[in-house]
Amino acid sequence: AGCIIHGLMDEQDLRKMGGTIRLLPMSYIMILIGSLALVGFPFLTGFYSKDVILEVALTKPSSVGNFTHWLGCFGAFCTSFYSFRLIFLTFINTTSSNKDYIENAHDAPVKMAVPLMILAVGSIFWGFFSRDAFLGFGTPLFMNTITTSFENLVSIDAEFASSSLKNIPFFLTVLGSVLSFLLINCSFSSKGVVFDYKMT
């Protein structure tokens, strides 16, 4: 987000952006990777960390566990909605930006791009290479840390939870992204009322 603000002359209003995918390609790729990891896209880091928390909450035999699970699922939906709203409004939607912002737009300089690339690599690969520590029985780390306490044995139940229940967060994530796209298209049409904004 900082790279985008910096590249568009400190503009922070999403409604005054749009159409910057060709002007800020590196920023677009980094924000896309970060957003996908944040919403728990399969096989990215956020997928492993988010889903294991929700599954453990679901299999905890208490009303608090069930409430926590559904609250987390709602959070996954909201996260997907606002993350993809950011991408659509900033990069993909028809531009509503000031002419000066477009003419002077520039992608992130090297000193800003390098840390983003390091974080992007971590977002893509860290969850995959560390997944056994959280999702399986194949490593001493899993056996010696997570299940040391009797209370943490519920994480074993999460391994064998119903697939249909495990897929709920993923479906809500997809629903959030689709609704974001539909509402943005609606709002920028002549009858849009959700994010209606008249540029001056």
Q: What positions do the PLM features span?
A:
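Conserved catalytic core of Hanks-type protein kinase domains
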Residues: G7, F47, T90
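Transmembrane alpha-helix interface/packing and boundary motifs in multi-pass membrane proteins
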Residues: G34-F43, W126
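Hydrophobic alpha-helical interface/terminus motif in multipass membrane transporters
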Residues: I4-I5, M17, L54, I87
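Alpha-helical multi-pass transmembrane bundles of energy-transducing inner-membrane proteins
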Residues: A1-L14
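Residue-level signal for the membrane-embedded core of alpha-helical transmembrane segments
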Residues: C78-R85
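Acidic glycine-/aspartate-rich tracts in secreted/extracellular proteins
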Residues: L36, T94-S96
